[in-house]
């Protein structure tokens, strides 16, 4: 069958781009329809800072009957295309297609050709045009599970399409999961936590919204100590920390955000949010006033979200390896034991295999198991060039790295 490709250039085209997955996944119960505006905002120069130094283009594919059967986007960021890369590298993403090899290859071709015309020599995919904590990677394991909010879900046949075209694994991203009922930590971990709890210098507690200013500064302090030891990681300023917290504030549950203190100084944090995918699927991408009211009711009143989404955690270097990570998890468990929280499971996403220290820490001290796997692929336009996988996250100095997860914007590859 022959296909016609069309550049997205009108409001009607954009609606086709947004609505295609709704048709492809209508019989897939695990898939959760994202908010239309979440996708639309990625390609809006007024709302996506990546356009300050880059460009993006989208295509639709139509069959002989005029039915939309595929889509793809390609993009590049001039500021970061060479960062930690041996060649200028762009990206492709938001790929969707019926199960047809010819169609998939046509979409990959048009993305590759456009990127090459703009000076790129490789493309990563499927990725986001912006932050790595959304729409990044191809699901290759865990199809039976519902995705976390803004995490990709796709059918199994996509893996074959990417790999047969010539994409190679640049890095893997693991999602870990664990129950949060009593007794889900190992005996060794409970013993470590008990030793800390017996020392009055240590304290573990959830935040209070009235103390948000103190939380912002504590978060920034720990983050900068925990992550400044990694190459390529910038210090977080107050404006960035405040912006992050203000973004999360509407959905924050203070009993999902924990800090560890030593002599009243912050030494660790663990930030979770309610996983919105538990309640937004029924909205079919729409978020008008009625759905906003339903959303608030389900989240704040009915408390229908039973899954916590671990966004990021960190421990200062001098406290790493002492059980502080487990202490914060145990504080959360104790809150769950009171019976006032609806959460029964915790998932931690975007833990890259380029950071084996973090993987070991999550498995050993958080007692979480691998639950899903996504792959970030890379395709080199020069097919004779040697392919190299993403290098492990390097340290600036000899101290052991602080625990942190998923910190999606601090990997050794760059945002495209």
Q: Language-model segments: which ranges?
A:
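Flexible loop/turn segments at secondary-structure boundaries
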Residues: 14, 68, 78-81, 131-133, ...
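Generic start-of-chain signal for non-secretory N-termini
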Residues: 1-31, 382
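Catalytic cores of nucleotide-enabled group-transfer and carboxylate-activating enzymes in metabolic
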Residues: 11-14, 34-45, 53-63, 68-71, ...
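Secondary-structure transition/capping motifs at alpha-helix termini
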Residues: 65-67, 116-118, 251, 261-265, ...
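Acyl-donor binding region in acyl/amide transferases
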Residues: 80-166, 283-365
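A conserved beta-strand-loop-helix scaffold within acyl/acetyltransferase catalytic domains
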Residues: 21-64, 72-82, 206, 210-314
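Acyltransferase donor/substrate-recognition loop-hinge adjacent to the catalytic core
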Residues: 3, 152-232
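C-terminal "cap" of GNAT-fold acetyltransferases
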Residues: 176-193, 375-415
């Amino acid at each position: 069958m022959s296909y016609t490709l069309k550049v997205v250039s009108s409001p009607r085209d954009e609606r086709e781009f947004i609505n295609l997955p709704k048709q492809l996944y209508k019989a897939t119960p695990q898939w959760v329809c994202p908010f239309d505006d979440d996708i639309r905002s990625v390609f809006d120069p007024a709302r996506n800072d990546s356009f300050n130094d880059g460009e993006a283009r989208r295509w639709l594919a139509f069959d002989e009957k005029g039915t939309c059967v595929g889509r793809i986007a390609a993009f590049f960021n001039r500021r970061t295309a060479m960062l930690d890369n041996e060649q200028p590298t762009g990206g492709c993403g938001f790929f969707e297609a019926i199960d047809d090899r010819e169609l998939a290859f046509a979409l990959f071709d048009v993305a590759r050709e456009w990127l090459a015309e703009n000076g790129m020599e490789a493309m990563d995919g499927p990725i986001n045009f912006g932050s790595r904590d959304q729409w990044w990677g191809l699901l290759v394991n865990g199809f039976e599970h519902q995705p976390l909010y803004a995490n990709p879900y796709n059918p199994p046949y996509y893996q074959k399409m990417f790999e047969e075209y010539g994409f190679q694994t640049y890095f893997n991203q693991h999602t870990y999961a664990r129950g949060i009922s009593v007794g889900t930590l190992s005996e060794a971990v409970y013993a470590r936590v008990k030793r800390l709890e017996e020392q009055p210098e240590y304290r573990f507690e959830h935040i209070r919204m009235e103390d948000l200013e103190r939380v912002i500064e504590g978060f920034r302090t720990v983050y900068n100590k925990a992550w400044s030891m990694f190459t390529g990681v910038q210090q977080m300023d107050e404006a960035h920390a405040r912006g992050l917290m203000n973004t999360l504030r509407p959905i924050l549950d203070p009993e999902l955000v924990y800090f560890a203190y030593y002599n009243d100084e912050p030494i660790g944090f663990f930030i979770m949010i309610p996983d919105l995918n538990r309640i937004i699927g029924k909205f079919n991408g729409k978020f008008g006033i009625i759905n906003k009211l339903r959303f608030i009711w389900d989240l704040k009143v009915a408390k229908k979200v039973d899954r916590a989404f671990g966004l990021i955690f960190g421990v200062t270097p001098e406290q790493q390896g002492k059980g502080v990570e487990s202490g914060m998890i145990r504080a959360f468990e104790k809150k769950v034991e009171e019976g006032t929280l609806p959460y029964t499971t915790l998932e931690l996403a975007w833990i890259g295999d380029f950071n084996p220290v973090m993987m070991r820490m999550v498995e050993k001290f958080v007692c979480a198991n691998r639950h899903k796997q996504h792959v970030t692929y890379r395709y080199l336009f020069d097919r004779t060039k040697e392919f190299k996988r993403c290098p492990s996250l390097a340290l600036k100095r000899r101290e052991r790295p602080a625990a942190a997860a998923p910190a999606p914007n601090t990997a050794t590859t760059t945002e495209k």
